[in-house]
Amino acid sequence: SELTISTKLGLSDAPLTYFRLGRGTDISKESYDCPVLYIGTDGSGSFHLNEDDEVKMSENDILYVAPKTLCGMSAGNEDGLAYIEILLEKEINMNSALKAGEVTKLKNLLDYEKGSITNLDLIGQDNLKFMIMAFDEGCYLSEHRAPGEAIVFALEGKGIINYEGTDYEVNEGDNFKFEKNALHSIKAVGRFKMALLL
């Protein structure tokens, strides 16, 4: 469809909005007084920064935009563009791996370690945490409960999420939502990378 749809996500106190731009649609440039993080969830398109900078965005890409930077979006003509917009606090703990105005593939920010799970925190603030994790073959997180709702973004490979006693397979490009205090575990099938928004 050729519509633009935005939906507020109630995952945390931080303002999170899911946007779906239909084929060939756009959002005019605007700026925020706070930093903004964009996470591509589906399709492809462009982000237009300031006067004439253009960066391409697609699934599992991440873009950090500095405060007071003009930013508009346009969807591709084939499949549209979907992304999550996160308005961050002015004072935030942001990992230096993220550079303002650069599109980054999340899965390329973290390497595998033999027999281990590696974790890289990208954003940390009181009401929001965003991290990426790399599970070597056979590694897993034991059953546990999280203090808030969360979304998993499968970045590479395949994993099995056990959620409240039921197994769910997630593959690159898939997302999975956890409710607050839901019992869950995650196991790699082969090597597996994911991002977690909590």
Role assignments for model-derived ranges:
Residues 1-15, 58-59, 63, 78-127:
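A short, N-terminal "cap"/entry segment at the start of jelly-roll beta-barrel domains
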Residues 2-4, 15-32, 115-119, 129-146:
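Conserved short histidine dyad/triad with adjacent acidic residue
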Residues 12, 50-51, 162-166, 189:
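Short strand-coil-strand connectors
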Residues 16-20, 37, 62-64, 130-134, ...:
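Conserved hydrophobic/aromatic beta-strand scaffold that supports enzyme active sites
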Residues 20-21, 31-46, 133-136, 145-160:
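Short, conserved beta-strand element in jelly-roll/cupin
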Residues 41-42, 58, 155-156, 171-172, ...:
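A cytosolic small-molecule/anion-sensing beta-strand core signal
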Residues 51-68, 164-181:
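Short acidic-glycine-tyrosine-enriched beta hairpin
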Residues 67-92, 180-198:
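Ligand-binding loop in jelly-roll beta-barrel domains
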